[in-house]
From Swiss-Prot:
A Pfam family recorded for this sequence: UPF0259
GO cellular component: plasma membrane
Alphabetized InterPro entries for the sequence: UPF0259
Gene that specifies this protein: yciC
The keyword Protein transport belongs to this UniProt entry's keyword annotation: no
Protein family per UniProt: Belongs to the UPF0259 family.
UniProt name for this protein: UPF0259 membrane protein YciC
SS bonds (residue pairs): none
Membrane topology of the entry: Multi-pass membrane protein
Transmembrane annotation, as ranges: 20-40, 87-107, 119-139, 142-162, 189-209, 219-239
Subcellular location per the Swiss-Prot or TrEMBL entry: Cell inner membrane
Species of provenance: Escherichia fergusonii (strain ATCC 35469 / DSM 13698 / CCUG 18766 / IAM 14443 / JCM 21226 / LMG 7866 / NBRC 102419 / NCTC 12128 / CDC 0568-73)
Length: 247
């Protein structure tokens, strides 16, 4: 059976429209969780204020020079802030992936599903999803840091790993290996979707300053919700495509 990207896009659009409110609530809940966890583990405002002083004194300096000129306490604040942002993002992404994939599974099986039920049903697989997303993010970031293209390629070839982990109950490394093989064989169907997702996330990042007009917490939740909606669309597409490839 020949699979066309157009037919999968159409199926994705239909599912997204039919389940929009549930998907929106899942995205909003995950954004709220991300922001709350980030706020809990982030340094206090007084500690963050010390970093503002460094920026003021070093407007013309490079990032490496700025970090070198920081005091030990300022470096600790920077590490804590970075760790809080990374950890909260990973938790939010794991819950989003688990909730969305379980939502798709249950709806496809004919069940009526709420956002809370979808997220709750994903609880048993969240530890494995967290590890998978951590490893995938690490590999993509390392690739982007060095030459960019390898990072983008890693994002593409590992795109099916969460779907395989949930749908076929694979282990973390088995799903990564299988995703690389299957994606490579279906690059024309997967690469455009992943690249579109990356472009959408990049555009949102560039527009992040627009959300500064709101309070920091509301702006962060709104930006994360939009980002989660982009990811939800990609997950729907990948799930539907994977089911067609397996037939």
């Amino acid at each position: 059976m020949s699979i066309t990207a157009q037919s999968v896009y159409r199926d994705t659009g239909n599912f997204f429209r039919n389940q929009f409110m549930t998907i929106l609530l899942v995205s909003l809940l995950c954004a709220f969780i991300t922001v709350v966890i980030g706020h809990v583990f982030s340094p206090s405002e007084a500690q963050l204020a010390s970093l503002d002083k460094v920026e003021t004194l070093s407007d013309n300096a490079g990032l490496f020079e700025i970090v070198q000129n920081m005091s030990l306490e300022q470096k600790q604040v920077l590490v804590q802030a970075s760790a809080a942002s990374t950890f909260s993002g990973l938790i939010g992404n794991a819950i989003l992936a688990g909730g969305m994939l379980l939502l798709i599974q249950l709806v496809s099986a004919g069940h009526r599903v709420s956002a809370l039920r979808a997220i709750g049903a994903s609880a048993p697989i969240l530890p494995k999803l967290f590890i998978l997303i951590f490893l995938t993010t690490l590999m993509v970031q390392i690739g982007i840091m060095f030459v960019v293209v390898p990072g983008i390629l890693m994002a593409i070839v590992l795109a099916l790993a969460p779907v395989m982990l949930v749908q076929d109950k694979m282990g973390v490394f088995a799903s990564m290996r299988s995703s690389i093989r299957l994606t490579w064989a279906n690059m024309r169907l997967i690469a455009p979707a992943v690249l579109s997702w990356l472009l959408a996330k990049t555009a949102l990042l560039l527009l992040a300053s627009r959300f500064a007009a709101l309070t920091p917490e509301v702006g962060a939740i709104l930006a994360n919700t939009l980002s989660n909606l982009f990811s939800a669309v990609l997950l729907i597409y990948l799930f539907r495509l994977y089911m067609l490839i397996r037939q």
